[in-house]
Amino acid sequence: MTETLPTPVLDTAQARVLGCLIEKEATTPDAYPLTVNAAQVAANQKTAREPVLTLQTGKVHHALRQLETLGLVRQQFSSRAERYEHRLGSALDLTRQQVAVIGLLLLRGPQTLGELFARSERLARFNDSDDVRHHLERLIQRGLAVQLPRASGQREDRYAHLLSGELDLDALQAAAARAAPSARSGADSSELEARVLSLETTVAELQDALSALQARLDAAGA
């Protein structure tokens, strides 16, 4: 798959599973590539996921096989268990930073530059938010991401991936408007966001440790 080929259109399960493979490659390298069970655990995490999903094992397995057909995932053959790794970077000729940005957008939906920069720490190195913007602009040029119009009450631009096709902008703006803080000052909002991101990182690290343990248990029981 090269730049001249059309962008794959992923369904909800495929997008979530692909995002999980991107995330876990960086955060739990000892447990990567992922087994089907580990991919399911990652897909159904209650933290660092928007929306929270409950995907059954069969659905996750089917999504992995479909992603494999699209050339975005490759199965690693093992005598103990099926394992899968993503090939997004090579399939679409993306840098590590661009893969990280796409992964975050797949897992957490539309986000601001600040959110992407803060949440990318464990996935890829960015110098600052402007560096994130640079890679986003490249993705936008490729038709893989888009800058969203600001909804009422929003102070910053948000970005979304286009691997699942065209977006329902009206629905996204309505959801963003409902979520926008109405009475909190800008300073208070920034401080709260920083605290939330710190807590999310801590919880995500704990979740990664559990995923690694699950992968070892899968291997031992296979």
Curated annotation (Swiss-Prot):
It comes from the Bacteria. Disulfide bonds: none annotated. InterPro entries: DUF480 (IPR007432), WH-like_DNA-bd_sf (IPR036388), WH_DNA-bd_sf (IPR036390). Belongs to the UPF0502 family. PANTHER family: UPF0502 PROTEIN YCEH. This is UPF0502 protein XCC4136. It comes from Xanthomonas campestris pv. campestris (strain ATCC 33913 / DSM 3586 / NCPPB 528 / LMG 568 / P 25).
